[in-house]
Swiss-Prot record:
A single BP term in Gene Ontology: ADP-L-glycero-beta-D-manno-heptose biosynthetic process
InterPro entries: Epimerase_deHydtase, Heptose_epim, NAD(P)-bd_dom_sf
Full protein name: ADP-L-glycero-D-manno-heptose-6-epimerase
Written domain comment of the UniProt record: Contains a large N-terminal NADP-binding domain, and a smaller C-terminal substrate-binding domain.
Amino acid sequence: MIIVTGGAGFIGSNIVKALNDLGRKDILVVDNLKDGTKFANLVDLDIADYCDKEDFIASIIAGDEFGDIDAVFHEGACSATTEWDGKYIMHNNYEYSKELLHYCLDREIPFFYASSAATYGDTKVFREEREFEGPLNVYGYSKFLFDQYVRNILPEAKSPVCGFRYFNVYGPRENHKGSMASVAFHLNNQILKGENPKLFAGSEHFRRDFVYVGDVAAVNIWCWQNGISGIYNLGTGNAESFRAVADAVVKFHGKGEIETIPFPEHLKSRYQEYTQADLTKLRSTGYDKPFKTVAEGVTEYMAWLNRK
């Protein structure tokens, strides 16, 4: 069996899809379906069982057995970079992750988890080294602290432990994320409403490493299949502008004039204006597949969003 926490969420459900594509259906999805709309991410996927997150955590703490587990993909967390309830964030993203990590280490179960580029903060160098890490929000701090915890226990680990610092992920199955969904998702919705697509004023200076979720899932699967351990950046290695995203959306629809709106006050000083993954460490593992450009990935995503 394979366990995917956050399996009804954005990246988790794409990992489930990638596993299905390999012929694996013996999957336990763990999630919190209080937001009932997330069920839609699982409708076209094949899984063996579902478990509520709180019940799962209780079972993990109690040391309950789930049978033979080939891997755990831990994507379940609070992913809202705008959430400022530190107690809630640390419980969800740090304490929960530690419990699950030790459960896997004790049973030598390969453990793959979601970290984040938010661990870096305001830097021009995005390399998996302590000197470049300085998160700007409590979400980034929770991910940073767990990475530090993993770094300390990795030398003693007898089974793979692998963290992925996701950069700006976009693509299918993010509909439930609301304001935290990707720019491409929001621009598509604006055009469908008959509006012009809108970017924040000054965003011509913002460049992000936008990575397609299918590529993210592929790296997770490859690292599992190859027994990789460590903490790795997961982006394309190439920063592109928000304008490039908007241009790809407009080109797909064949309509829309890009407008600018004021930059939100609450995001100032808490916003990464530039991200670009240094992929040297990931490439050193032997992973050599290419990543989709914004033009390629957004076009594929638009086709998925607007399918009949």
